[in-house]
Every structure is written in structure tokens, then in C-alpha cells.
């Protein structure tokens, strides 16, 4: 197996250089485009990429605006999408990256799957509601269902910070509202981000990485709020085809989503989707790619990708035979 690894840039919807990595196979059986979470970066997914390469899948990932090299190499602050229309630009960047991936693989007919973690799961869900035929399926890790009362509180406190601070200042109130209680369920915490994983080595590495764990601006949360709102209502799922493959994967002790993914999956089923699954991992927290039982997670991802790829092939073969 030969992997063509490269770091590159592509243009975002407004011309901004978006920094990305590819782990590309010459003849993959499928392709995965990954969207990372908040206050982290694409290079944390290298092991995941290598695992999927070994299973026969090409892997692509980019640093969102306000994250990783997309922020730093453009001399832009970490934790700030854009001064205007940040969420729309994040969605547009995914579209541009997908178009580049399709162009690079134009002679290969294989399914393209979307993987989204945490904030990336919100981006993924909003994207597939808007562009339901762009991907062959989606895997969502560390996802959450934001309640209407939570949306109301977020909107109120974002407005409060906007009024007293302005949009470009780092948020304190909203930041605390979202994250301050995440460690409370655990007795073994040494660092503020230990809720991410029960693997202390992984959380230590995150804590010591200057490209992780940064505070975000008031405008960032204002943009993110739009994504949360777009994905909060069942009516917004109606654009997705009923047989679109979707799986939610969460640590049972994840304070962000946890067992709430059961209700989240049910909401998609209520919208008419028939190919929705979920799995909870006992004792696991937010970042399944860094948990002690990550091998089980990797195996589940590969098995799901293989299963959905084969289902799609059977469907295509049946269509050809019926003609």
C-alpha cells in the first residue's frame, strides 16, 4: 500500500487559503473527508487517517477557519471564523474541498463519506441538509442535540457579550456556559480539558499543544449559534433522502452528547430517515479517536464504511441489471 501524503492549500469561498492534508491511495475503495472539532486542528487526526488508509480508504482533512494553520499561516487569530458570515464560509469551505477531492479522483467511482467530530458534526449535519446528495453517508462523533432553551440562553448571552465587549473580543460568559461544567462528572481530572478523554496522555498532549484549547471570540459563538440553530429542528432534516446512511458515535460519559445521541438519532428517524444508527461506548468520553478503547471505535468505523459501500454497490448493480 502506497499512500500519497501531502499538505496543501485550497481556496475558501472568499479566496482565503485553507490548509489541508491528504492521505491518498491510488485505488481506494472509498474516500473520507473529515471535519475536526472546535479548538483543535487537522494534525491530531493522523493516526485515524493511517488506520483508514490500511483499510483501503483515502482520507482528507482541512483546518477550519480560526483553527490550525488556516488561522496561523494567514496571520489570523485562533478562535475566530470571520468578521462576517463565518458559518456560511465554513460550509462553503467544505464544498470547495469536496470539489477538489472529486476532481483529483474523477477517474475513480467510489463512495465519498463525511466524518464530523464535535463542532465538525454540526458543520456536517448542516451541510448534508443543504447538500443531501454530495456524500454517500456521514459518521458523526461527539455530536449533540441542542435544546431550544439552550439556544435561547446562548442567543441571550452572545447578545450580552456583543453589547459590552464587541464581537472580536474573546468570550468569557458563553465559554463558561458551554464548558465550565464538563469536568464535574469525573473524579480523576487534573486539567480543564480532561473531559475530552479518559486517556491522560492524550489530554496532556492536547493541553500542551498551543494550537488546541484556545478561547474563541464572541463572533465565533455567534456564528456557531447559527449552525446549532440550523441543526436543532427536525424540519431541517426533511431535505435528506430517506436512505441516506447516518451513524452517531459517542462516549457514554461524553458531557457534550453522551446518551443524548439516542434522541438525536430518533429525531432523524422522525424526519423519515430509515438508515440511521448509533453506538455508545461505555466509560468513553468526548474524543473517541483518543480513548483507551479507540481500536474498537476504529474497527466500528471501518465496518460501517465497508457495509455502506457494499450496500451502495449492490444498489447500483441492481439498477444496472433492471435496465
Segments predicted by a language model, with ranges:
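Active-site glycine-rich loops that stabilize anionic/oxyanionic intermediates
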Residues: 37-40, 118-119, 252
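Alpha/beta-hydrolase active-site loop
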Residues: 81-102
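Alpha/beta-hydrolase-fold enzymes
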Residues: 124-211
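Conserved alpha/beta-hydrolase "acid-adjacent" motif
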Residues: 255-263
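Catalytic active-site module of serine/aspartate enzymes centered on a nucleophile-bearing elbow/loop
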Residues: 277-323
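Conserved alpha/beta-hydrolase
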Residues: 49-75
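N-terminal cap/lid segment of alpha/beta-hydrolase-fold proteins
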Residues: 1-24
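Short beta-strand/loop motif that positions the catalytic acidic residue
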Residues: 248-250
